[in-house]
Regions:
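Amphipathic alpha-helical assembly segments used for oligomerization, scaffolding, or translocation
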Residues: 1-330, 351, 385-389, 444-445
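C-terminal structured domains
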Residues: 298, 302-446
Length: 446
């Protein structure tokens, strides 16, 4: 099939640019993973080294021209990093919630011990009372408080015989422990709402959101009448769940903004620099309202820059390949192609024949067809036209080989057979005011 063709071109230049953009976003994703883990207190140096090793392996793929593998694996790696970071945040939240529950249990136990000591008429030292009432010291003060509840030693005035008898009587008796004492106390029911609050508060902390206003309200619930506690707790839980949802979304948006800023870092245009500055200010100010618009703007700019790069690279690759095959390619033809939508190249060895290139302006599809130069008034040698169209078939295959050898590729989307349509005739008359680079040739259909 060597008649008019519609084809796609992928160049090594385009593939390298796309892969480098992927790697920049991967670097930003690794930095985001590190930041999240450090903030949550779950940083793992060994895992961080593994992340870096995988990143280095992916970069080696670029050096080895393994473009397809890299473009598949980098998005998967970024997805894994995000998922892993979220899992670690959730684990940190669970651990923090458990710590909150433990502190709450310790505070309850300390209050119970103080009440028991007071009821037993024990003299509680001021420092012990202070330690039992302070959350950070309550747990370690409990053993000392419990010791005051334990049976007192025998009176020092007792005789040796009395002490010996008491020792024999208690020899096989198990001494009560704090756990035994707690087991004998009325059970304190931990509300499900308290556990959920702890989890939400912990996740807010892990997300970098200040949980103190919610924590203060949660603490104040204990002072409310029991008839109102459930209603207030439900209301607080709704607000906490909403805050966590917003925190996750904001964290994801800012992470995406940082990745986009990293991808824009190689673009030194005025527009890209200004956009990077705006992204930086939005992230620093935690301006979630402008994040969505900035993300859309950054993606549009990146896509447009890549489209222009890819389009220019495709035109250059095709023109350079045709020059290698003996077609006359002049400086400025790429520009003429962009401006005019098509360009005609003459075959140096057979100047009465050539090819016409078009497309690539509004889509990534290019068109090519063999053409003949001459006059509409002159008779055509149809047999020779068919022969030259067949020659172009083999030359197009060589063009595919050349582009492939440079790391790119050409894929034919649609092609007609030799002779399926008459050879397009280009009126070979150049106007005096035209240059060699841009020929405004009158096109006639024979």
């Amino acid at each position: 099939m060597s008649g008019p063709k519609v084809f796609h071109v992928v160049t090594r230049e385009e593939l390298v640019a796309r892969c480098e953009a992927h790697l920049r976003r991967l670097d930003a994703a690794i930095a985001e993973w590190t930041k999240t883990c450090k903030r949550s207190g779950v940083m793992d140096a060994e895992v961080a080294e593994q992340n870096a090793a995988r990143r280095d392996a992916l970069r080696r793929m670029l050096n080895e021209d393994r473009f397809t593998e890299l473009q598949k694996q980098v998005p998967a790696e970024i997805s894994f990093l995000r998922s892993d970071a979220q899992t670690r945040v959730e684990r940190a939240a669970v651990a923090a919630a458990q710590a909150m529950q433990n502190r709450r249990r310790a505070a309850r136990t300390a209050r119970m011990l103080l009440e028991a000591l007071t009821k037993a008429g024990r003299d509680v030292p001021a420092d012990l009372k202070r330690d039992l009432e302070a959350p950070e010291t309550a747990e370690r003060a409990m053993a000392r408080a419990f010791a005051l509840l334990s049976p007192v030693d025998l009176n020092s005035a007792a005789t040796d015989r009395q002490r010996k008898l008491a020792s024999e009587l208690g020899r096989d008796e198990k001494r009560a422990t704090l756990a035994d004492w707690l087991a004998g106390q009325p059970a304190s029911v931990e509300r499900e709402s308290e556990l959920r609050m702890d989890r939400h508060l912990a996740e807010l902390t892990a997300l970098g959101v200040d949980p103190s206003p919610f924590a203060a309200r949660a603490a104040a619930l204990m002072g409310e009448p029991s008839s109102r506690q459930a209603l207030l707790a439900d209301s607080l839980l709704v607000e906490l769940a909403h805050a966590v949802k917003e925190g996750r979304e904001k964290s994801a948006r800012f992470a995406e903004l940082r990745e986009l800023a990293a991808e824009l870092a190689h673009d030194d245009s005025t527009g890209a620099r200004a956009l990077r500055d705006r992204i930086g200010m939005a992230v620093a100010a935690e301006d979630g309202l402008s994040a969505a618009a900035l993300i859309a703007e950054a993606n549009a700019l990146i896509q447009e820059k890549m489209r222009v790069l890819a389009t220019d690279a495709r035109r250059r690759a095709v023109l350079q390949g045709l020059a290698t095959l003996g077609y006359e390619v002049n400086e400025g033809m790429a520009t003429a192609w962009v401006q005019g939508g098509q360009v005609v190249l003459r075959k140096a060895a057979n100047p009465e024949y050539g090819v016409e290139l078009g497309g690539g302006t509004k889509s990534d599809r290019l068109q090519v067809r063999a053409v003949a130069f001459g006059s509409a008034q002159s008779p055509r040698n149809t047999s020779r036209d068919l022969d030259m169209e067949a020659v172009w078939c083999s030359e197009f295959q060589r063009l595919q080989t050349l582009v492939s050898a440079s790391g790119g590729g050409i894929e034919i989307e649609h092609a007609l057979a030799v002779g399926a349509t008459p050879l397009k005739l280009i009126e070979d008359a150049t106007r005096p005011d035209e240059t060699d680079e841009v020929r405004n040739l009158k096109t006639l259909q024979r």
